[in-house]
From Swiss-Prot:
Residues 1-79 are annotated as: Disordered. GO terms for cellular component: cytoplasm; cytosol; nucleus. It comes from Schizosaccharomyces pombe (strain 972 / ATCC 24843) (Fission yeast). Belongs to the UPF0654 (con-6) family. This is UPF0654 protein C11D3.01c. Residues 22-45 have a biased composition (Basic and acidic residues). It comes from the Eukaryota. Pfam families: Con-6.
Length: 79
């Protein structure tokens, strides 16, 4: 059985693909509107990985101060 998150991602990708016709893009948009919110709880992002990503961003010297502040805020929202 396909991962619903991957299926939704494929439809979203089609919307941004310049090789896809406008007619197909319209169908993809309608599909996404009809199936909004259907990705089940078991397919949500792993909270531990998300938390680790924010912590890594806060300690990465290549990340701007503004982005570090946002990562800190998002991390606080997770807890």
């Amino acid at each position: 059985m396909p991962n619903p998150g991957n299926v939704i991602g494929g439809h979203k990708a089609a919307l941004h693909n310049p090789n896809v016709s406008e007619e197909t893009k319209q169908r993809e948009k309608e599909y996404l509107e009809e199936h909004e919110g259907e990705v089940g709880e078991e397919h949500q992002k792993n909270t531990g990985n998300v938390r680790g990503g924010y912590k890594a961003a806060m300690h990465n010297p290549n990340v701007s101060g503004e982005a570090k502040q946002r990562a800190q805020e998002e991390l606080e929202n997770l807890e």
